[in-house]
């Protein structure tokens, strides 16, 4: 599998084949543009919410609750450390722009996009979602930025008839408190994903109630148990907001899409919010809907 260590070993081997054991290392993170921290995100999140960069490791985190303020340089230093272990001395590390005439001497190939999407959904990886949305923006001729990603998502919603009056997209992860999306649009998007094999990875990546990802510890009370193992859904939580959207199979075999949103709930604990969402889905799973 692709890894920084594998890339360092291949790079070191290529350099040694050229008779080189000492280099200066430049790193280029210019694929993405604009701010790395959204102006629509709360400033109090800066300490723990990762910056979005085209070059980073460990999802831009120094630890679980500590964001890396300089993801590209951290990635470059980690690469230099692995080069050293492979027998290459790095004399300097600098930010630069790769020349178009540069020669590639080593590469590794990432997991497939389908697997990346699945992991992003399963653990609710905000940086993963932002990175995917930036690549989608670049593929559609837009900047790899927050604005470019938001414009790309908005355009996709419009093309597929999922745009509703009052909706607003500010990022690719849903972190912005100013994002606006209706439950109807979410349910319609889920219906599209189930019907179109293009989005098979999205369906496969949804957490399963009481089994995987962000739903592994949910649906744990008796009133929620009808949803266990049959509800497949993406979770979403911000202060005062929680959501659950996906699909389920009822006890008589009907496959239904659903989307639930709870707003203005800052006085209610997350546990109570989750219980409400889970019980609502469980009630639907118990129904005879044919």
Residue ranges and their predicted role:
Residues 1-54, 58:
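Periplasmic/cell-envelope proteins involved in peptidoglycan metabolism and beta-lactam response
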Residues 28-32, 42, 58-62, 137, ...:
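Solvent-exposed coil/turn segments that connect beta secondary-structure elements
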Residues 51, 57-200:
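A small/polar active-site loop signature that marks catalytic segments
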């Amino acid at each position: 599998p692709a890894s920084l260590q594998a890339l360092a070993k291949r790079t070191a081997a290529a350099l040694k084949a050229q008779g080189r054991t000492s280099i200066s290392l430049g790193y280029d993170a210019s694929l993405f543009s604009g701010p790395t921290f959204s102006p629509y995100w709360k400033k109090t999140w800066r300490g723990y919410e990762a910056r979005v960069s085209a070059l980073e490791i460990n999802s831009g985190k120094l630890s679980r609750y500590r964001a890396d303020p300089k993801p590209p340089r951290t990635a470059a230093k980690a690469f230099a450390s692995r080069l050293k272990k492979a027998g290459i001395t790095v004399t300097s590390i600098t930010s630069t722009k790769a020349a178009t005439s540069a020669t590639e001497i080593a590469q590794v190939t990432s997991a497939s996009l389908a697997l990346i999407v699945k992991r992003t959904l399963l653990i609710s990886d905000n940086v993963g979602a932002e990175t995917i949305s930036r690549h989608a923006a670049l593929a559609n001729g837009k900047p790899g930025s927050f604005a470019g990603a938001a414009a790309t998502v908005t355009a996709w919603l419009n093309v597929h008839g999922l745009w509703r009056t009052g909706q607003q997209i500010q990022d690719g992860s849903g972190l912005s408190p100013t994002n606006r999306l209706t439950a109807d649009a979410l349910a319609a998007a889920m219906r599209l994903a189930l019907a179109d094999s293009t989005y098979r990875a999205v369906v496969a990546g949804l957490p399963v109630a009481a089994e995987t990802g962000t739903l592994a510890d949910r649906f744990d009370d008796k009133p929620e148990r009808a949803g266990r193992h049959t509800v497949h859904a993406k979770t979403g939580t911000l202060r005062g907001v929680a959501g659950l959207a996906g699909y389920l199979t009822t006890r008589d075999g009907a496959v239904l899409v659903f989307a639930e949103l709870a707003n203005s709930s800052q006085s209610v604990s997350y546990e109570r919010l989750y219980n409400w969402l889970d019980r609502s889905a469980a009630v639907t799973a118990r129904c005879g809907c044919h």
